[in-house]
């Protein structure tokens, strides 16, 4: 198979041993950033982040909403700086793919789970250098 699923972050409770007991500690791991870091560390050819929408969008949920298709990382950074992406939603995904593309020079894709089988067809938001 040419696809290797990568999953990281979320779902665990971080603990430390204190006085011979396990004690929960605050620790939040962003799934998008950890997936991008893992993809970078294993030298993945491509990072794919699956979400509930087919693309990232400019002017999301506005009358002039428009999907972002193939986009250079520099343009995506401009959209990010303009506040186009919601914190805690699309923003961390955008930041993660920007970091991955800038550090590796490889491509990243944000799309929906239903599009996962169509990646070779150019679906989703495709971020490149």
Question: Language model features by range: what are they?
Answer:
Residues 1-129:
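C-terminal catalytic "cap/lid" subdomain
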